[in-house]
Structure formats: structure tokens, C-alpha cells
Amino acid sequence: MALHDENVVWHSHPVTVAAREQLHGHRGVVLWFTGLSGSGKSTVAGALEEALHQRGVSTYLLDGDNVRYGLCRDLGFSDADRQENIRRVGEVASLMADAGLIVLTAFISPHRAERQLVKERVGHDRFIEIYVNTPLAICEQRDPKGLYKKARAGELRNFTGIDAIYEAPDSPQVHLNGEQLVTNLVSQLLDLLRRRDIIRS
């Protein structure tokens, strides 16, 4: 479909975002976790989602590996495919936030420009960039999927942090130390969500 196809018209709906948020009892936002492979993005995002669920908050977690089973199954790992992967995820996350959910996304998303595009699509007031900052050496020690080992051996090309660049956020809304306990990081994030009046409990 062309970007500006004259036959495609955006339809407004009688149920507004504000009405959906009122029903859920909290705001709809996107929590965008970014960091190297093995930094703890998925672990922290999953623990935060569990904590929010226990508090009656409506959530959904979009994980980098999981979306490639369906939504992005046709994409590889070239620069163009990675950009399209993040674009699709950003679109889905934006729709879910419109539905009043707190959407957690765990993606390396190595390029600032791509993260900025998602932020603009979602809306600056509904997008929270969370940088899980974990030293490369620690990520390599963890190496939960054995990817760093393959990259170091030359068996895996264009791997972020080894032979492909990761552009750390210049000024993320949240900067987490990935070497801290997950429980501490979740507490920090819950406090942030309360301070910003995103959740009440």
C-alpha cells in the first residue's frame, strides 16, 4: 500500500483513548526497553509485567524473539529488515497503547534514529525509553543463547556489540544499571510509573 493512497482513510472511533484508559484505571503507554543482548531487557520487562499484573494493571509484553515467530517471521537481520522489524513493533505498540494498555517492549533496537521514529509514532508523552546499561563483558558472560560465542568465533555476522554498532541512548527517560538485582530495577520502575501518574497502586 502506498504511504498516501487516496483510497485509504483513517477512521475515528466513538470510544476514545481516554475512555479506554478510564476503564482500565491507568494510562496507556509504551515502555521501550533497549540494550545489548544479555543486558537483561527481557528479564526486567517480564518481571515488571508480572508486578503490574499483580496490581491489576492491563499489560502486554512484546519480546524481540517472540515477534519473529509471527508478525516479523518474513524478516531477516539485514539493516533494512531490522529497521522494518522495529517499525512494525512500534506500530503494534502504539495501537496497544491506544487500547489503554501498558506495553512493554524488549528489543535491542540498536539505532537511535529507529527509536526516535517509534517515539514520534507513539507520541512523546506516551513513550518511555528505558536503557538497560550492562557492560559488554557482563553480557558476554551471561550469553543466555550462546550468541556472543558464535559471534566471536565468526559463525554469526552483524551481531550487535561485536561487529555491529549499538548506539546507546543520549538521554533516556530511564537509565538502569543492568548489574543490579532485578527486584531493585522493578521497584525503580514502579516508582517511576507512580510518580508520572501512569498507575495508581
From Swiss-Prot:
Catalyzes the synthesis of activated sulfate. Its EC number is 2.7.1.25. Pfam families: APS_kinase. One of its GO terms (molecular function) is ATP binding. The active site is at S109 (phosphoserine intermediate). This is Adenylyl-sulfate kinase. One of its GO terms (biological process) is sulfate assimilation. InterPro entries: APS_kinase (IPR002891), P-loop_NTPase (IPR027417). It comes from Salmonella gallinarum (strain 287/91 / NCTC 13346). NCBIfam families: apsK, PRK03846.1. Pathway: Sulfur metabolism; hydrogen sulfide biosynthesis; sulfite from sulfate: step 2/3. The keyword Chaperone does not apply. It catalyses: adenosine 5'-phosphosulfate + ATP = 3'-phosphoadenylyl sulfate + ADP + H(+). Belongs to the APS kinase family. ATP binds at G35, L36, S37, G38, S39, G40, K41, S42. Keywords: ATP-binding, Kinase, Nucleotide-binding, Phosphoprotein, Transferase. The keyword Ribosomal protein does not apply.
